[in-house]
Amino acid sequence: MARLTESEARRQQQQLLQPRPSPVGSSGPEPPGGQPDGMKDLDAIKLFVGQIPRHLDEKDLKPLFEQFGRIYELTVLKDPYTGMHKGCAFLTYCARDSAIKAQTALHEQKTLPGMARPIQVKPADSESRGGRDRKLFVGMLNKQQSEEDVLRLFQPFGVIDECTVLRGPDGSSKGCAFVKFSSHTEAQAAIHALHGSQTMPGASSSLVVKFADTDKERTLRRMQQMVGQLGILTPSLTLPFSPYSAYAQALMQQQTTVLSTSGSYLSPGVAFSPCHIQQIGAVSLNGLPATPIAPASGLHSPPLLGTTAVPGLVAPITNGFAGVVPFPGGHPALETVYANGLVPYPAQSPTVAETLHPAFSGVQQYTAMYPTAAITPIAHSVPQPPPLLQQQQREGPEGCNLFIYHLPQEFGDTELTQMFLPFGNIISSKVFMDRATNQSKCFGFVSFDNPASAQAAIQAMNGFQIGMKRLKVQLKRPKDPGHPY
């Protein structure tokens, strides 16, 4: 009864302070309880309504929604330039309970005539953000505790708007609940006072009280967990999850570019690949050293390139076919990777075997054996990580740009980047938004800097299920002037 009294007090206070508006769709039958016309609760919810036919306006939609309570405001969204119907609307009820009833009864439950997908009825983005920092997740409860027991536990910290104990299909408690306060300050006070403060009878650990995750955060966490599992099972997805992934990938690309432009032939095995790195000795689960190797000769060596980490190096095959020469005592697996399975032949020059070793302790000699342009860039690439891209590119090279469809409507550019970042270096990411409604169109683009990352993302994320939808991830079609349609 205390909750009802506080709710009525808030409502009466608002009736005295708030002017009487006359918005679109404010008229309707008087609901039980005698709510005055045009007044709304302080905690009323603004709903976003999507997937409505474009020929329906406010007066056509009112009969559908006013069965759940008095409508404070109903506005069909239209293009500000053309005036055309956008197929969506904003809806606010006078009473908060009416909005909850409408969402429960209609969201993805009813398909309006002429539409292929069911109607969307959910809190607008502004409402979701506002409730995020006052809704708490409570774990490690006694499974015998009811909503009333949880209310008694949290009521000393403020006004509670909602309290729900999570239950299984058989009605038994799962030992956790959601509690929503009327303000962030009250929720924060409850966390500080109750989190870890006691252990409930029958619980395995102390009470857990924290801010509840949003749907967006839960979806992202589930995606990251799935990608992490794929990284363990699929070697090609292992490298991007290591601490040195961005640095190692950029270094590989830089070295490959330097050697390919120097006039020398580079064996394909010399370029590191995720599956080859795992063959090198003294590595961790992800194929990389557990800790960075100390720099040698004043150089900041990358994790895989130190004088102690590379027992043997193979000289590149020059235009004169000088030969592939392994160092004595080199690691067999490393020599296999570098030689790419080739049988080593004696070098024509006695100094070829020592040519590349100074690159890791200071290039000071044997410079006449190779062109200066071939050695100097390598020496500069070892001490420091490659610089970031100087300019933000809108698209990556061909084969590196992905089209993603069926994104959750709550996802923005940041969430899209977080979703695909584990697969490699992202040049740009963009979720397309409706300018009139500021709502996501549920599709976007992600551009990587190499095709391998794009293919890994397609392999892992295409068909990933989110709610009732599955992500569609595919290569963006290249621009072809000859086929504009």
From Swiss-Prot:
Segments of skewed composition (Low complexity): 12-28
Residue ranges of the region described as Disordered: 1-40
Keyword Repeat recorded: yes
Tissue spec. comment: Expressed in brain.
UniProt feature, compositional bias: Basic and acidic residues: 1-11
Predominant cellular place of this UniProt entry's protein: nucleus
Keywords: Cytoplasm, mRNA processing, Nucleus, Repeat, RNA-binding
Entry keyword annotation includes Repeat: yes
UniProt name for this protein: CUGBP Elav-like family member 5
Lineage: Eukaryota, Metazoa, Chordata, Craniata, Vertebrata
Gene: CELF5
